[in-house]
């Protein structure tokens, strides 16, 4: 490991109109064996810039507080080892540390993530059995355990291009929100219906399955495959499955709502786009029917066991 390194850190805060204002400042820091990025930031605070704002708490990858962009990638600073950063940084180039770009700036490396918690208030709470003891087996809980491991670091939100690049904060609730919602919607004893809100209010159709949120999740949650796609399939089952309600399906399709789910395929002048869109919808419908059957079977088994025990 190098004896010293140059960190180029964003320093600034919003102006009176709330517009971020600041600059990148270089700090040369001595390194010790085994340091992580957060250690270096703390050393900069101790030796160069005591007013450098940085949010952190556990330094163990459990609280999600120290999220930032290191060399352009969303990461937890406490879990990002300096030897890995040095290996990816070109020789004689500084290491870049910036705040998350998808959230309003508070100061330096600290951002305001209150938007995400305001979104949470729109989720309907769980609606389970009236009996005081909720009984279901571990195999049914395994699906939820993954979602409960979220540390709310907001890295998935920061890397989501719908929010980061297109600023669709009113239309799209974001990947972290759907993880939280999935933990309730997929509970084996939950009877609440959130499908209309998922479709209309939370904008799940804006996600086009790039899986960038999954790639940056430090908890290893399969956000796209295990949360977002199953929720999309439930929407398709509810609104577009002719096996469930042919009349409603025909009405939804003829009203043009299908474009909500096939937006990427319907753009442009390629004559094959319509065929692609139809093929995509058929695949969605097939997966939705299979998911509906599996969910119904799991729910019915859980309820039978609950009543018998």
Regions found by a protein language model. Name each.
Residues 22-36:
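Short, contiguous acidic and Ser/Thr-rich linear segments
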Residues 24-28, 77, 94, 161:
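Well-ordered beta-strand positions in beta-sheet-rich domains
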Residues 10, 69-73:
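Short strand-turn-strand beta-turns centered on an Asx-Gly dipeptide
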Residues 58-67:
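Short, structured protein-protein interaction patches enriched in aromatics and acidic/basic residues
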């Amino acid at each position: 490991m190098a004896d010293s390194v140059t960190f180029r850190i964003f320093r600034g805060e919003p102006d009176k109109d709330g517009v971020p204002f600041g600059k990148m400042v270089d700090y040369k820091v001595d390194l010790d064996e085994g340091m992580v990025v957060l250690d270096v930031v703390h050393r900069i605070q101790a030796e160069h810039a005591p007013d450098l704002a940085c949010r952190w708490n556990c330094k163990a990858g459990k609280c999600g507080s120290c999220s930032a962009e290191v060399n352009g990638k969303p990461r937890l600073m406490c879990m990002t080892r300096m030897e890995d950063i040095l290996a990816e940084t070109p020789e004689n180039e500084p290491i870049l540390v910036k705040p998350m770009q998808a959230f309003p700036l508070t100061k330096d490396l600290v951002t305001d993530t209150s938007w995400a918690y305001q979104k949470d208030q729109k989720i309907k709470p769980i609606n389970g059995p009236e009996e005081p003891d909720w009984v279901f087996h571990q195999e049914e809980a395994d699906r939820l355990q993954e979602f409960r491991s979220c540390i709310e670091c907001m890295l998935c939100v920061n890397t989501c291009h719908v929010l980061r690049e297109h600023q669709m904060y009113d239309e799209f609730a974001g990947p972290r929100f759907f993880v939280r919602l999935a933990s309730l919607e997929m509970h084996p004893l939950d009877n609440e219906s959130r499908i209309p809100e998922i479709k209309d209010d939370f904008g799940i159709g804006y996600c086009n399955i790039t899986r960038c949120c999954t790639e940056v999740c430090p908890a290893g949650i399969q956000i796209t495959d295990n949360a977002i796609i199953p929720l999309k399939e439930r929407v398709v089952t509810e609104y577009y499955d002719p096996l469930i309600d042919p009349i409603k399906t025909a009405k939804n399709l003829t009203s043009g709502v299908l474009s909500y789910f096939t937006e990427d395929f319907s753009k442009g002048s390629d004559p094959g786009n319509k065929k692609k869109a139809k093929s995509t919808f058929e695949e969605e419908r097939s997966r939705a029917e299979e998911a509906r059957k599996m969910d119904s079977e799991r729910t019915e088994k859980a309820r039978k066991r609950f009543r018998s025990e």
